[in-house]
């Protein structure tokens, strides 16, 4: 079995924090986001991190630092988000370039999952078709923001992308298993949509469309788990994921006469004086004085003074 970890996006929703760093390499507790995925895949024959040329060296440095002997980097042929081949397009290109002919895991590298991968693989081996990990968001209003799976038992009956009236609360996550015989679904899917009026940037960049199409061609199954799942694409998602993996706040910097609320993460070398902070992440070597910081991420080497900040993303070396 092989795995492809998708890490080629430019994460524009978290810019400027992720403008010059790959989102899967952001710290989550004591290690990068992607490490939570890869440490569970040590027994696989090979894991390929699919990324772009801009971040390829960063991922190679990560592999070397964490001594991931079964992991290597494959570079997508694009530099900007506009040139990106799309999630499905990147997988198809990789299948062609690497001539992959094996059972395959496809995993979003910027997600955090708390389930045990070996349990998931045991489940997959008992099935005779692709499996999509799903998560019950338990709220119909929340379900409108996800690709939603409707099931009959554990078999996929329908898939709807961000429905106004969700048929269930089971959200499709970026974690898929394809047995060797079904890896060809990617090429069949591409061939099908090439003959339609659907723009390539739609059918090659929306994984939900593959599920929507493929479940009518073959039996597809769901694996549901209890625990936590976070798609780390927003400030709130990042803060909630951080809170899930650590016990309480992380305060590695200095605080003086400051009110530290819940879900606060202050990294090495940073200082807070006369400041109120809650639901926020402050990267290393940043100074915050006489301010209120809520639901925000402040990058390294910033100087913030006398500022009321809410729902903000502040890039490195910023002075406010």
PLM features: what roles do these ranges have?
Residues 19-24:
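Short alpha-helical oligomerization interface
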Residues 132, 148-150, 175-177, 229, ...:
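Conserved hydrophobic/aromatic beta-strand scaffold that supports enzyme active sites
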Residues 25, 148-151, 222:
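A structural signal for short hydrophobic beta-strand segments in well-ordered beta-sheet cores
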Residues 2-5, 13, 26-27, 31-108, ...:
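Conserved N-terminal catalytic core of the sugar/cofactor nucleotidyltransferase
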Residues 47-52, 133-134, 297:
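Short internal beta-strands
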Residues 250-320:
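Structural signal for interior beta-strand "rungs" in well-ordered beta-sheet cores
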Residues 105, 112, 118-125, 138, ...:
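Catalytic-core segments of class I nucleotidyltransferases/pyrophosphorylases
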């Amino acid at each position: 079995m092989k795995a492809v970890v998708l890490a080629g996006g430019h994460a524009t929703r978290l810019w400027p924090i992720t403008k010059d760093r790959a989102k899967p390499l952001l710290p989550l507790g004591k290690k990068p986001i992607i490490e939570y995925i890869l440490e569970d895949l040590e027994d696989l024959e090979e894991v390929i991190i699919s990324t772009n040329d801009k971040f390829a060296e960063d991922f190679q440095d990560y592999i070397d630092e964490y001594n991931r002997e079964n992991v290597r980097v494959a570079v997508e042929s694009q530099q900007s988000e506009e040139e990106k081949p799309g999630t499905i397009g990147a997988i198809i290109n990789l299948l062609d370039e690497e001539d992959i002919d094996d059972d395959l895991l496809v995993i979003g590298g910027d997600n955090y999952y708390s389930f045990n991968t070996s349990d998931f693989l045991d489940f997959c081996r008992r099935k005779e078709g692709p499996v999509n990990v799903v998560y019950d968001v338990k709220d119909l209003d929340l379900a409108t923001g996800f690709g939603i799976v409707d099931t009959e038992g554990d078999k996929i009956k329908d898939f709807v992308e961000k429905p106004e009236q969700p048929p269930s609360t089971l959200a499709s996550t970026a974690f898929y298993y394809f047995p060797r015989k079904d890896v060809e679904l990617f090429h069949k899917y591409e061939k099908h949509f090439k003959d339609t009026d659907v723009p390539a940037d739609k059918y090659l960049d929306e994984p939900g469309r593959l599920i929507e199409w493929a479940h009518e061609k073959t039996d597809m199954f769901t694996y549901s788990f209890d625990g936590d799942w976070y798609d780390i694409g927003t400030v709130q998602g990042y803060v909630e994921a951080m809170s899930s993996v650590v016990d309480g706040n992380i305060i590695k910097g200095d605080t003086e006469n400051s009110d530290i609320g819940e879900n606060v993460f202050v990294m090495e070398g940073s200082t807070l004086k006369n400041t109120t902070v809650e639901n926020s992440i402050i990267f290393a070597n940043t100074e915050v004085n006489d301010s209120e910081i809520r639901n925000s991420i402040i990058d390294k080497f910033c100087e913030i003074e006398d500022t009321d900040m809410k729902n903000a993303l502040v890039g490195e070396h910023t002075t406010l």
